[in-house]
Amino acid sequence: MSFMKHSIKVSFQEGEVVIEANRDGLRRISEISAKLASLTDSEARTPANHFHFIEGMKNVETGSLPLVITLKDA
């Protein structure tokens, strides 16, 4: 398994949330989204139903806004 150096920056510009990412960053967001989409209904009712992109987790660029991707209960 190779180490991916992803770059993700989340900002708010002119009334819009903007996510800027390199290819590895976009793949990371896609992987997280795919994993959330594959949760079972019972897993979706647990804390496993979301993922944080925040500076404290070192998974976004410095100065980024926090981003949470959540599986909405269907």
What label would you give each PLM region?
Residues 1-74:
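Positively charged, low-complexity terminal tracts
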